[in-house]
A protein has these predicted regions:
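Phosphate/anion-contacting hairpin/loop surfaces
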Residues: 1-2, 6-145
Length: 145
């Protein structure tokens, strides 16, 4: 969840940015300031791992968690580059998230607005350049072949 200022809400509304809603919130010790919860309503289809580039594969041994009966089986995970989704699944909103969750994605229009009006405390990264890990998969799973 993200809290945004009234200034940013007005900027997005004045520019008819789609795929988001705003709900007033109160931040303790800052009741005099107007902040809003940013809710993302835009969607795209699930993320397509097959189109991302594997940068590195890291193998790990079977591990027993100390003082427990938990055993993490031997396996590996991949460090990936690029985030892809079926373009036809995108509802064309300016703010959107994949149906299986994940980071907020914005259009070039939103990126340009945020930069032009010097909105702070925001990190923007091209989805083609995103680095992420595929998760840890035990040796005997299809995702680890």
């Amino acid at each position: 969840m993200f809290a945004i200022s009234e200034r940013v809400v007005k900027l997005l509304q004045d520019n008819k940015i789609t795929g988001c809603k705003f709900y007033p919130i109160t931040i303790n010790d800052h009741e005099d300031l107007s902040y809003y919860l940013l809710a993302i309503t835009g969607r795209c289809g699930a993320f397509d791992i097959s189109k991302s580039k594997v940068i590195e594969t890291i193998e790990y041994p079977e591990t027993v968690i100390q003082n427990s009966n938990i055993v993490i089986p031997k396996g590996k995970f991949s460090v990936m580059k690029g985030f892809h989704f079926p373009l036809a699944s995108w509802d064309r909103s300016d703010f959107f998230i994949p149906e299986d969750g994940g980071d907020i994605i914005v259009t070039e229009c939103v990126k340009d607005l945020l930069k032009k009006y010097k909105v702070t405390n925001v990190v923007l990264e091209n989805i083609k350049d995103m680095i992420w890990n595929s998760g840890i998969y035990p040796e005997n799973t299809a995702l680890n072949s």
